[in-house]
């Protein structure tokens, strides 16, 4: 049975794990890393780069290198979050025809779901290389506070990457699985998850294989990227004060600042102070300029104080919604790389009144939890019951622009809820169902998930027709809504499926493109391997001829081998993989004669050496005997005679 992998698709880094021998194991990438940077780039040759290779070239190619795409997925171009990001991101974000956003890389537009699919395809390939078999099924994690459109867009990304996404699971819930799988006693835990781009807090009751989420809250636009930007702004401001040059206007310099800011932030988790040195950061008429700034932990904490303050309210709301007080929480589990920051840990301690639990690896625990959930779905992990919740309330717009909630936030999923509504005017022939997600009282202040019409309602006074609206949330947290005229039985439904901004046709086309790209990558890899093999074979053969001595090979054999070498050298410069392999095989066959000649030469030399040594000793013995040096003669003579 093919394995199902667990993927933590992160803002900054992604991680993949799989169940092996009853335990979840993180799969290392080809560079040996246990996490892969969530970065995609298109280089000047039009080649797509993913992960570490994309990160390495980001400084020289900032406009065509995408990072932090998770903060954009499932969002509209005009949303406040996207408008904020446009001001600080080096790559171009444009408005799509349907109001969604597109990322422009080398004059080609990509949706955030498509960019995410490139990361997922790379992770899928890593897993396949490790497992030695094709991987199609996966469990992918998302922030608990992701909206329906963000979840659907993530699922679409998986589909484009060639994955069958069995389940979308919330990151804190996945982390709780990894933490609590072997715990026998009942515990109330809070999972505090601060990652590269998102913040989640979930309160759960766990024990004896049951993981019940009581409440969840968060901010899908708060994370390490925001902390980095504060440091970047500080460095740019200090440099401008000192040199009069604004580095924010130089995208290459800005990318160097970003990398330096991220590194400094990490160093300050273990050191009270760090030096930021960026030689040749820019230049003016007087020559090159260098940046050298000291940054203390205290200064960093001052720069990000308001971001740290933002973490308190979601925690307080989650506690209130769960029905528990902070003192009733047994453990606070830290998840996400940003929780290594001492100031974050101090805030957690202040909010919950206890030191946080650091027993799990914050970078890997979510992927491990996803792999455990994959094991549950596959039947490899038994006696685990996961009861997750919907993070936001769901409802429809009713008379006066009010949002009427059908499903309250923190309702256990999957769930289904119906309510009967009626018409607002006499003889109303149709009703428009405006599906909403959010906590505000007025429809305009909540997020629109979709709209659909139920038509052909028989003429009747207002308030008479009975329209039953049903909300259905599946285990992935994805919503389907239907409206039924109870009088006629006529029904209309909507599954919120185009939330990634991509139609079914567009997704199918992208799936085909991804498959073609995978085939192209495979062919490219085979060509490079064939060229490398040919290179090594040519080198080895030419070296062997030189070692043997050209006079030791008969002319016909030498000419045949030389001709094969020349043919292979020419083929090696082409892109014909089959021809390179064929000529490599032919040169290998021709080289067998060379190997025979070398073996014969080695045998002859061995025999000559053996015979020659014996003769020399005997001769030496005789002449020395004449010289009367008996002791030496006897010893040498006996040794040679043996």
From Swiss-Prot:
The modification Phosphothreonine is found at residue 198. Residues 594-642 are annotated as: Disordered. Gene3D superfamilies: 1.20.1270.10, 3.30.420.40, Actin, Chain A, domain 4, Substrate Binding Domain Of DNAk, Chain A, domain 1. Induction: By stress conditions e.g. heat shock. GO terms for molecular function: ATP binding; ATP-dependent protein folding chaperone; unfolded protein binding. Acts as a chaperone. This is Chaperone protein DnaK. It comes from Desulfosudis oleivorans (strain DSM 6200 / JCM 39069 / Hxd3) (Desulfococcus oleovorans). The gene is dnaK.
């Amino acid at each position: 049975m093919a394995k199902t992998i667990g993927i933590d698709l992160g803002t900054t880094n992604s991680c993949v794990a799989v169940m092996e021998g009853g335990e979840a194991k993180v799969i290392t990438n080809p560079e040996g890393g246990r996490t892969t940077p969530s970065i995609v780039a298109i280089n000047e040759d039009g080649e797509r780069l993913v992960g570490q290779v994309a990160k390495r070239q980001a400084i020289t190619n900032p406009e065509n290198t995408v990072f932090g795409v998770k903060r954009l997925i499932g969002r509209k171009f005009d949303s406040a979050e996207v408008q904020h990001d446009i001001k600080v991101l080096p790559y171009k974000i444009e408005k799509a025809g349907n109001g969604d956003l597109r990322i422009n890389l080398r004059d080609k537009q990509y949706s955030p779901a498509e960019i995410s699919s490139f990361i997922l395809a790379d992770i899928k390939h890593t897993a396949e290389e490790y497992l030695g078999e094709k991987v199609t099924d996966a469990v992918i994690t998302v922030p608990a506070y992701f909206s329906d459109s963000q979840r659907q867009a993530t699922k679409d990304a998986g589909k484009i990457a060639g994955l069958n996404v069995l389940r979308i699971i919330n990151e804190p819930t996945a982390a709780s699985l990894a933490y609590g799988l072997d715990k026998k006693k009942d515990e109330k835990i809070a999972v505090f998850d601060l990652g590269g781009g998102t913040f989640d807090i979930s309160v759960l009751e766990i024990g004896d294989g049951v993981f019940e989420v009581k409440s969840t809250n968060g901010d899908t636009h708060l994370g390490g990227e925001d902390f980095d930007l504060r440091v970047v702004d500080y460095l740019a401001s200090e440099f401008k004060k000192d040199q009069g040059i604004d580095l924010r206007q130089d995208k290459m310099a800005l990318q160097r600042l970003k990398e330096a800011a991220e590194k400094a932030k990490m160093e300050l988790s273990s050191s009270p102070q760090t030096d930021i040195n960026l030689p040749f950061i820019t230049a003016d008429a007087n020559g090159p300029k260098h940046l050298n700034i000291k940054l203390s932990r205290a200064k960093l904490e001052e720069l990000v104080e308001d971001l740290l303050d933002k973490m308190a309210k979601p925690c307080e709301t989650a506690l209130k919604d769960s029905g528990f007080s902070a003192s009733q929480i047994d453990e606070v589990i830290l998840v996400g790389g940003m929780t290594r920051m001492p100031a974050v840990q101090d805030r957690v301690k202040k909010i919950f009144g206890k030191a946080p639990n650091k027993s799990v690896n914050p970078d890997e625990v979510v992927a491990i939890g996803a792999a455990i959930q994959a094991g549950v779905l596959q039947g490899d992990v038994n006696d685990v019951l996961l009861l997750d919740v919907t993070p936001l309330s769901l409802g429809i717009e009713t008379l006066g622009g009010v949002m009427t909630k059908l499903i309250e936030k923190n309702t256990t999923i999957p769930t289904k809820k119906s309510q009967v509504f009626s018409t607002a005017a006499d003889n109303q022939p149709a009703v428009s169902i405006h599906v909403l997600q959010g906590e505000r009282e007025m429809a305009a202040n909540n997020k629109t998930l979709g709209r659909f019409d139920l038509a052909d309602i028989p003429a009747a006074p207002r308030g008479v027709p009975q329209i039953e609206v049903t909300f259905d949330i599946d285990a992935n947290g994805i919503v389907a809504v239907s409206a039924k005229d109870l009088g006629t039985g006529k029904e209309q439904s909507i599954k919120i499926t185009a939330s990634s901004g991509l139609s079914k046709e567009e997704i199918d086309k992208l799936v085909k493109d991804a498959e073609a790209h995978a085939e192209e990558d495979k062919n490219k890899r085979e060509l490079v391997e064939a060229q490398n093999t040919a290179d090594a074979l040519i080198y080895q053969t030419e070296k062997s001829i030189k070692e043997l001595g050209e006079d030791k090979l008969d002319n016909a054999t030498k000419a045949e081998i030389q001709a094969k070498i020349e043919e292979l050298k020419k083929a090696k410069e082409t892109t014909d993989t089959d021809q390179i392999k064929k000529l490599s095989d032919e040169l290998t066959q021709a080289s067998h004669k060379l190997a025979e000649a070398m073996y014969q030469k080695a045998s002859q030399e061995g025999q000559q050496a053996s015979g020659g040594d014996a003769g020399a000793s005997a001769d030496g013995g005789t002449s020395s005997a004449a010289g009367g040096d008996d002791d030496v003669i006897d010893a040498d003579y006996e040794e040679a005679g043996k």
